[in-house]
Design a protein with these regions (language model features):
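GST-like domain detector, emphasizing the conserved glutathione-binding G-site
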Residues: 1-81
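Surface-exposed helix-capping loop/turn segments at secondary-structure junctions
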Residues: 19-20, 96-110, 132-135, 160-167
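All-alpha amphipathic helical-bundle segments outside canonical DNA-binding/catalytic cores
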Residues: 21-31, 83, 102-115
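Amphipathic alpha-helical packing segments from all-alpha helical-bundle domains
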Residues: 80-99
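C-terminal helix/juxtamembrane-tail motif
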Residues: 156-176
Length: 176
């Protein structure tokens, strides 16, 4: 078996090995998979294109490959505007879904899942890493301030001892 995509690797590991992040039933696995898909979508279509702008990555091949060539029409300012709007739409959709379906503190209730960890990573990246100051400026300092349910999930994940040990100050220390 050869897997070269980090998301496929995570799903494989969670499926193959029993552990604290393993879904407890097929229904829970489907729900977690749905949240995982949201995170993957957010990462691919918001975070990665923002990263291209932050780093000045101007190679159209990679931007076109991801179907997110935000710099193709209108340049950096238009790219930032479009990505900020996309961020807001995606976050609002997840927030509305969580308000209707989540009993908290995690995405599926009382158990942390691999989707919770990925959501935490996406949110903390925008809130704390150096390069995403561009998004913070446009969003009034915190891109997720209008989304309390999302922040509730991330705060719960951030309180997990293993997450604290692993993440530490890595987000704040990251230059981009």
């Amino acid at each position: 078996l050869e897997l070269n995509d980090s998301m496929a690797i995570v799903q494989y590991l969670v499926t193959k090995y029993e552990g604290p992040l393993t879904p407890k039933s097929p229904d829970q696995a489907a729900i977690i998979g749905n949240y995982w898909a949201w995170c993957q979508d957010y990462y691919s279509f918001v975070l990665s294109p923002f990263h291209d702008i932050i780093t000045g990555h101007n190679e159209p091949f990679w931007r076109n490959l991801r179907l997110t060539d935000t710099l193709a029409e209108g340049g950096k300012e238009t790219g930032i505007k479009n990505l900020t709007e996309l961020h807001s739409k995606r976050a609002k959709r997840l927030e509305q879904h969580l308000k209707k379906s989540s009993s908290g503190p995690f995405l599926t209730g009382g158990d942390c899942s691999y989707a919770d960890i990925f959501l935490y990573t996406c949110v903390r990246t925008t809130q704390k890493t150096g390069g995403f100051g561009i998004l913070r400026e446009v969003c009034g300092n915190d891109p997720f301030q209008a989304y309390p349910k999302i922040l509730e999930v991330c705060d719960a994940v951030g309180k997990i001892e293993k997450v604290k040990e692993t993440a530490g100050s890595k987000f704040s220390d990251c230059p981009i």
